[in-house]
Amino acid sequence: MNYITFESTRPFDLVLLGRVAVDFNPVDYFQPLEECTTFKKYVGGSPANIAVGAARHGMKIGFFARVSDDQLGDFVTHFFQKEGIDTSRIRRCENGEKIGLTFTEILSRADSSILLYRNCIADLQLPPDDIDEEYIRNTKALLISGTSLAASPSREAALKAVMLAKRFGTKIIFDVDYRSYSWKNKDEISIYYSMVAREADIIMGSREEFDLMEALIEPGRDDLKSAAYWHAQNAKIVIIKHGKRGSTAYTCDGKQYTVRPFPVDALKSFGGGDGYGAGFLYGLYSGWEMYDCLEFGCAQASMMVAAHSCSEEMPRAEEIHAFIRASKEKYGETVCCDREEM
């Protein structure tokens, strides 16, 4: 079943709104960060990674963002341009705000973490004036990253973008993307997340992220209750992730589709969600069946946790198909598809 119909005549497949960052991942990993001396620099930030992943699948991508007016701002902008991502709405901060920096600590294949520098941060300086009607009118879908809602003026910019998308019939994708370092208290998380989720056609997040979003609405829901609630608002597809236990897509016709992760020798514990988002959306835009979209997204996620970077090593579609074939030959079928009424 085709749950989402995109306006085929629009030039952009997807415009994203959210943070662009710079990741520093150690080359000499499997030791504490304080002992690492050599790092590789990559473009980072969840929506930025999704943008790169989608662009490598041949999708036409645009981006609303603010970045620092310095060499690191040049770095991320030029990387996007090389990937074929439109940067006409990525603008420089004017008051010295800096792009976020992320240092990765990889102690072992089972133990990794990040150290963030986000004081006076550039991405949350995105003002409503940067959000123009033409750009949103010309895209099939708008993806809002939840981190953009953490503070003004980015918060108002994101809400303006959602309002314009509703006016022009642009589909809205909400990637909850909770990052604790950006928020002041849990009430505002629930308030602003739920404002966007009520308008979204697709909602993607972990069980923990849904709990935060629903804290002021009805705490303690299970997945079925969460999906039913957001379907009653506007959502056609609700994806709830459970990490290594897999994820389930709940669709507006009462069906649910569950997929388990592909076995890999993971290097780090993050980056998978960004690959998942890019892969799932590519399948959806391609008109695939829901279980094929999920399988493809899950495969891309598995490949990303085994990779050193989250952006530069985003795989192309043919690489993911080859990975799926090889994995099934070795481990058997991964997808478990249930079609049960909710």
Task: Describe these PLM feature segments.
Residues 141, 147-225, 245-246:
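Conserved beta-alpha-beta core of the PfkB/ribokinase-like small-molecule kinase fold
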